[in-house]
Amino acid sequence: MTAPFLQVEGLSKRFGDHQAVADLSFTLARGAMLALLGPSGSGKTTTLRMLAGFEQLDAGRILVEGRDVTPLGPAARRFGMVFQHYALFPHLSVFENVAFGLSKDADRASRVAEVLRLVDLAGFESRSIGQLSGGQQQRVALARALAPEPRLLFLDEPLSNLDPSLRERTRAELRAALKQIGITTILVTHEQEEAFALGDLVAVLKDGRLQQLGTPTELYEHPQNQFVATFVGRASALPGTITAPGRVRVGDVDWPTAGSATGAVTTVVRPEDVVFTDSGLPGTVVERRYLGGRALFRVSTAAGTLEIEAPMASAELEAKVHVTARRSLSFNRDSV
């Protein structure tokens, strides 16, 4: 069995009374892209800083290709970093920014040209930073991080400075470039769409603890707890009671459900798994949001509010309706 490229064992960090990261462990294969995803204060950035060597660990260790790099400083670890605000030098040209961390030898110009080709900025060497768009500046920062040939690349909220209209295209370009290079990458983001688009794997963090590590599909389809189920993607959470294996009662209606929970539960259901029906849980349409071809409805019921994705003509605002779920996930109420 091939040993992991990166092995993180029991990372912990406390700031005073605040446990920022607690006993975090995971492995990452060479060339994989991992997205650290979580709400504010979940420990994403602290984890990244510990891995990069900018923050001292209270406990744990970090191994790269089997070697313990925990005692090493940032430079000795040979990791690259793209900061949230890029940290480019506005008074220097693109070439000078990318070459900043390279030794002044005969290969410097060829290395700068090589990484600029990789990020699709060939011919931009003489331009100033002020002449570039936000997406181009992001790629200059990426080229500078790649120029010293790091073993591992870190991206801190890499697309947060871009307009929403640019993010989707830039995400695709960034992932394609990193996959072409084949560099192992860890990125921090609070945006689920960004994490799912860039990460081969996504680690969901909450209160400094790893909730689940898996592919985007695994997190969405098979969340391990209620937090992951409701944090990843859109979902409605309602109180229910398990009445039989694979069945949960919500209000006066039984739905199919998955999970090992018993007794009183919280049932989580995705908008695409809820349908309007002739008989089911009664409710009132309190919101109807056009999505283009379909709509997102919010239906208030005695058991709670459900979101439903359905054709726009399915129901009018304030209409009295009945709804049911084709599938759901149930969790014991202490599993949050």
Spell out what each predicted region is:
Residues 60-68:
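Conserved ABC transporter NBD signature motif
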Residues 76-80, 84, 88-227:
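ABC ATPase nucleotide-binding domains
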Residues 58-61, 207:
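Conserved coupling/switch loops of ABC nucleotide-binding domains, chiefly the family-specific signature
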Residues 52:
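Helix-to-loop junction immediately C-terminal to a conserved catalytic motif
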Residues 37-39:
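The feature captures the beta-strand-to-loop junction immediately N-terminal to the Walker
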Residues 235, 246-336:
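Non-catalytic connector elements of ABC transporters
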